[in-house]
């Protein structure tokens, strides 16, 4: 609402928030034709005060739903090309967003509960919880018609193993700074959809309660 007066007929909007709900909220507020779907991914950022240290820098995954006009997507990628900002164009952006939700639900929440960084997530018990939470997301995604696979899950595990051991997911940083977390976007979403599809989500239930 604070930016509504800045949005005109030619404005294109992307959301770099995690989860799978922000595009729907923006589309309802401003019109789906203005929204290019986006996933910010593959970065490890540590924020201290007003400074951020980012390594790796990551990129944006961009797309529009099947059947939507790609004109704004093409204009956006032309801009990113001009400023040399990395991006990728997944074949199915909705599936890609669910894939990112899967890794966030696992790694971010587990890091917050275990009070650890990426190195700690490689320890057996933390990794068991992280991967278990991700598998529950996969089951819910499949029920929603999103074909996530074990290969997708293991691909994300490999990506996280490449992050610095002393790096920290954003929810771990939120916990240390006593900021409101993204738990409703992650296990909150999976628990709600799991209940609709009668899919048990015991690990996400536990993470939700702990957080």
Tell me the role of every PLM-derived stretch.
Residues 1-51:
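Rossmann-like NAD(P)(H) cofactor-binding subdomain of soluble oxidoreductases
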Residues 17, 56, 61, 175-176, ...:
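Short glycine/serine/threonine-biased micro-segments
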Residues 18-20, 39-44, 66-68, 93-97, ...:
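Glycine-rich beta-alpha junction loops
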Residues 46, 113-114, 164, 168:
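Short amphipathic alpha-helical interaction/hinge segments
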Residues 5-6, 28-34, 49-151:
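Internal alpha-helical scaffold of NAD(P)-dependent oxidoreductase catalytic cores
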Residues 71, 81, 131-211:
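NAD(P)-dependent Rossmann-like dehydrogenase/reductase catalytic/cofactor-binding core
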């Amino acid at each position: 609402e604070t930016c509504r007066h800045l949005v005109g007929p030619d404005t294109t909007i992307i959301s770099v928030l995690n989860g799978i709900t922000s595009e729907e909220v923006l589309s309802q507020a401003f019109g789906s034709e203005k929204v290019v779907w986006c996933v910010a991914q593959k970065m490890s950022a540590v924020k201290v005060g007003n400074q951020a240290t980012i390594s790796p820098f990551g990129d944006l995954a961009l797309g529009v739903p099947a059947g939507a006009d790609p004109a704004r997507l093409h204009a956006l990628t032309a801009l990113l090309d001009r400023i040399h900002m990395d991006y990728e164009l997944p074949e199915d952006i909705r599936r890609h967003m669910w894939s990112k939700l899967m890794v966030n639900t696992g790694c971010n929440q587990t890091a917050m509960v275990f009070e650890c960084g990426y190195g700690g997530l490689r320890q057996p018990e933390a990794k068991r919880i992280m991967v278990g939470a991700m598998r529950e997301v996969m089951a819910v995604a499949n029920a929603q018609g999103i074909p996530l696979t074990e290969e997708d899950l293991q691909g994300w595990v490999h990506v996280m193993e490449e992050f610095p051991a002393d790096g920290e997911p954003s929810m771990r940083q939120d916990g240390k700074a006593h900021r409101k977390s993204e738990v409703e976007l992650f296990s909150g979403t999976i628990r709600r959809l799991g209940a609709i599809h009668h899919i048990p989500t015991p690990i996400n239930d536990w993470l939700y309660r702990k957080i």
